[in-house]
Amino acid sequence: MRLVDAHNHLGYWSPDGTQSVGELLLEAEKRGLHGVGISDHYDPDCEMSDGSPWTFDPKAYMEAFYSKRRMPSKRQEGDPPGFLVGIELGWMPEVSDVLHNVIRDYPFDFSIVSIHYFRNYDPFTHAEHIYTSKLHKVYTEVIHTIADSAQDMKEANIVAHFDFFSRYAPERDSKMHYEHAPEAFDRLFRIMMENKQALEINVGTVNSLMKRKDYALKDAMPDEKILDRYIELGGDLFTICSDAHHVEQNGLHMNETLQYLESLGITEFVWFEERELFRP
């Protein structure tokens, strides 16, 4: 399988990352990947403990990594894995212009749009301000917000971890299901298909549900009905990622997730080079 694991983070560039680019590339080679990408956090709406925004200097990022790029589409047998330079855009309406500008001004191979804050709160630190009603109500609002982000950031290539907020809900059984937000999911998927944006399967959520909520591996997998509905509506652009922030997270439970997806008929995962869509 020609697999490109594009959503990963590095120490220094992402405040919550610790791995180096060398470690990431070594892990990619060990795993036999076709390619790997970096996509560090660019969340102008989030603040670190000192009050500074959760962003990096894109000019310095390009100076550090752009010349190291290797296009997976040009990879030959025996070559090391491809290496792509992307960005994860933390969306909120008030920072929309900032996000549009950064991907206009810098030649990222791909951009990932994501929601990390909701109602101006971080679910990791202020869950009590987010999960204030039944899960179906919270998840409906969340998915509509993700749909808003996909609609606004039409130029973004990938919509990240739709199930991110299931990681931090106080309920023991917090896995996100299609039945939680059917109309919102349908709206999101239609927007994504219109924009030719890929749906990300984020193995980080699988790992989080197992670690935080004691889910069995098979039960932590993405909801089958969500994926079936995306396909039913005409969606066929999938990516799968480790969302690794630390060395030990690279490929963690990736093979099991791939096997699960294969059982649903999902066997092809796309990637983006110079913002152009590639299929295996």
Q: Which functions belong to the PLM regions below?
A:
Residues 1-10, 21, 166, 172-280:
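Charged catalytic cores and adjacent phosphate/nucleic-acid-binding surfaces used
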Residues 18, 44-45, 52, 106, ...:
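Divalent metal-binding pocket/active-site signature
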Residues 57-67, 71-75, 82, 103-105, ...:
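Histidine/acidic residue-rich metal-binding segments in metalloenzymes
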